[in-house]
Amino acid sequence: MKPQDLKLPYFWEERSPQIANHVFYVPNYYSRYEEFVMPTWQELFANNGPICCELCSGNGDWVVEQALKDASVNWIAVEKRFDRVRKIWSKMGNYRVNNLLIVCGEAQTFFSHYVSDASFQKIVVNFPDPWPKFRHRKHRLFQDLFVQDMMRTLVVGGQLTLATDDYNYLVNAITVMLKYLSPGLKSPHYINVKDNYGGSWFENLWRSKGQEIFCTEFIKRVGI
């Protein structure tokens, strides 16, 4: 199964949310998201197992590895670029992964329109774009509204993890998460990951360039 075997199920002018070939397409610049009736997680995965979600899935190395480790845990991979979605889909097929759903679209749109409260045991954000220029910071994932939305979708005791090579991004994200979640690590609330994080393509890329990898974890407590 090759990446190019996956085709977009619509032309741009006819775009609409739809699920095909284990991919949920959430198009940009669309105004009728609520018209799509989202299936239940049980219908999508054909089981009642716990669900974890990775954002910024890239080429899918990390999430496919996680899905293969434990078939009883369902995974959702969210990636906005279709060329990368194709690579995730190809890996999923070639490794015969049955506990993975790919979302092709913006994480914020997927969460706000299609993810119900207390859906996820864990959310992992792997190497998001740091948008380092000040004028671009409005595009960062870790802003108040979206962190609140991620918190909403976690079960009590659920975990939100961020891995990044950008220290300034890390510190800013921690500042936001401290408003809504409980830190899972002692102050300064992050660790330097030496190894054993996983097979992320971006992790391997930044390590090859001599970059440090940082990881932080936050927990949704009772009453939050």
UniProtKB/Swiss-Prot annotation:
GO terms for biological process: RNA (guanine-N7)-methylation; tRNA methylation. Pfam families: Methyltransf_4 (PF02390). Its EC number is 2.1.1.33. Keywords: Methyltransferase, S-adenosyl-L-methionine, Transferase, tRNA processing. S-adenosyl-L-methionine binds at E54, E79, E106, D129. GO terms for cellular component: tRNA methyltransferase complex. Pathway: tRNA modification; N(7)-methylguanine-tRNA biosynthesis. SUPFAM superfamilies: S-adenosyl-L-methionine-dependent methyltransferases (SSF53335). This is tRNA (guanine-N(7)-)-methyltransferase. It comes from Chlamydia trachomatis serovar D (strain ATCC VR-885 / DSM 19411 / UW-3/Cx). The lineage of its organism: Bacteria, Pseudomonadati, Chlamydiota, Chlamydiia, Chlamydiales. The gene is trmB.
